[in-house]
Amino acid sequence: MANQPKNYKKFVATAATATLVASAIVPVASAASFSDIEGNTHADAIKALSDAGIIKGYEDGTFKPNAEISRGQTVKLLGRWLETKGYKVPENWNTVQRFNDLPVNAADQELVKYAALVKDAGVFNGSNGNLNYSQPMQRQQMALVLV
């Protein structure tokens, strides 16, 4: 991933910025209907990522741009983005466990799928074999993911 074109790195940096200021993975609302992003510094990035299907809002029509984001939510965001760039979810995503703390039969199958994609693509390696998907994504961790 380190030898990607500049536009890739710029987009990932923009995605990371939106990620670090947003809780973006819970289903529903479109960017046009987010009731809480008007005037937000990152509103344009949030709208662009929402329009691309990479991030989602909450069922109540909000985006919560200042909420903390978890490592699992970050994995989903990056997985969706990688798909838009032509990366394919591994065929064995639901049979081969990638992280010790995320079994292939976990309730959140979207997380299992995208965890396989980002792990196999070398984007997200976890800590000591664990994804720690419910833990907050720290800025220094995001920096490591982006490099």
What is each stretch, according to the model?
Residues 141-147:
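Short, intrinsically disordered, charge-balanced linker/junction segments flanking boundaries
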